[in-house]
């Protein structure tokens, strides 16, 4: 597989050929290279981060109760996989409701998990459908607590809780619109007086459709190539409506809620035939849970 960067793609091969060196392109390794290079290719060709949407849901498709409670839907093993993924990305994105409901830390904490959770990944990797080498590497990886992805909060919350894990240090950014910012600080002195330590980015856009473009530009400016979108439903819907989710990693637990919050609150489709059909789909068992992973488009996408 040639380097997707058009500035260098194929030049090394050509130099070798010019020097009389035989070069063989190992096509059998294409799937492996494609799985590992998707994010890099998008970043190089389109200048935007690669967005991975991770959700844990019940069998009937709920990520939380109507109260907002979501602890815990998935098993220890599945949550450990999420910490492995946090070790692989540059940023973790949440919306204001998740920020208020969960007080998330968004860091890598292998010490939170039992030996049983770790041992579930030592029993071999059983991937069905398309064999995904990114997932294989993720399953084998050890979560590294020294890696701290950038914490990203989208939207201005109604208030900042005392002792918020999100604001424990300076490795974060808050992205909101000027309209939302002005409305919230006018109503709440807690927000007006809070020290965001120059890590608040306020966008001038009024059109909601431009929100995600602004967010992606901010992430790029922070050096983010891969970002995990951890939700909740509202921010997932915002990214989904904008066509900005590249990879879906959905964990399904054998629980039935009966009612609750869906993973994506996006614009409805009139017909099921209009629903997004994913490519290169892989499924895997993680303890008692099932992981389903797929991509918005195939690897052979080009510059937009």
Indicate residue ranges for each PLM-predicted region.
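Active-site loop-to-helix "anion-binding N-cap" substructures in soluble metabolic enzymes
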Residues: 1-34
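Enzymes that bind and transform nitrogen-containing heteroaromatic metabolites
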Residues: 10-18, 30, 50-304
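Proteins enriched for Cys/Gly/acidic motifs involved in redox and nucleic-acid/cofactor modification
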Residues: 26-56
């Amino acid at each position: 597989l040639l380097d997707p960067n058009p500035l260098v793609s194929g030049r090394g091969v050509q130099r070798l050929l010019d020097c009389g060196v035989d070069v063989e392109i190992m096509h059998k390794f294409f799937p492996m290279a494609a799985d590992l290079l998707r994010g890099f290719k998008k970043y190089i060709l389109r200048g935007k981060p690669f967005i991975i949407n991770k959700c844990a849901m019940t069998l009937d498709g709920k990520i939380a109760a109507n109260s907002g409670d979501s602890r815990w839907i998935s098993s220890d093993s599945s949550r450990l996989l999420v910490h492995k993924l946090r070790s692989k990305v540059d940023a973790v994105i949440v919306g204001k409701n998740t920020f208020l409901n969960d007080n998330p830390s968004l860091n890598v904490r292998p010490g939170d998990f039992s030996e049983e959770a770790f041992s579930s990944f030592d029993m071999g990797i059983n991937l069905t459908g398309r064999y995904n080498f990114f997932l294989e590497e993720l399953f084998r990886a050890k979560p590294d607590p020294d890696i701290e992805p950038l914490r990203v909060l989208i939207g201005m919350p109604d208030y900042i809780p005392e002792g918020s894990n999100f604001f424990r240090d300076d490795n974060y950014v808050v992205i909101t619109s000027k309209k939302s910012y002005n409305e919230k600080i006018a109503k709440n002195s807690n927000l007006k007086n809070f020290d965001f330590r120059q890590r608040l980015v306020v966008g001038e856009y009024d059109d909601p459709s431009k929100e995600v473009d602004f967010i992606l530009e901010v992430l790029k400016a922070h050096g983010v190539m891969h970002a995990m979108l951890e939700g909740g439903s509202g921010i997932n819907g915002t990214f989904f409506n904008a066509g900005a989710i590249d990879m879906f990693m959905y964990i399904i637990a054998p629980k039935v809620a009966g009612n609750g919050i869906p993973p994506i609150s996006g614009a409805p489709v009139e017909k099921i035939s209009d629903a997004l059909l994913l490519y290169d789909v892989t499924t895997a068992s993680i303890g008692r849970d099932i992981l389903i992973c797929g991509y918005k488009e195939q690897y052979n996408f080009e510059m937009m």
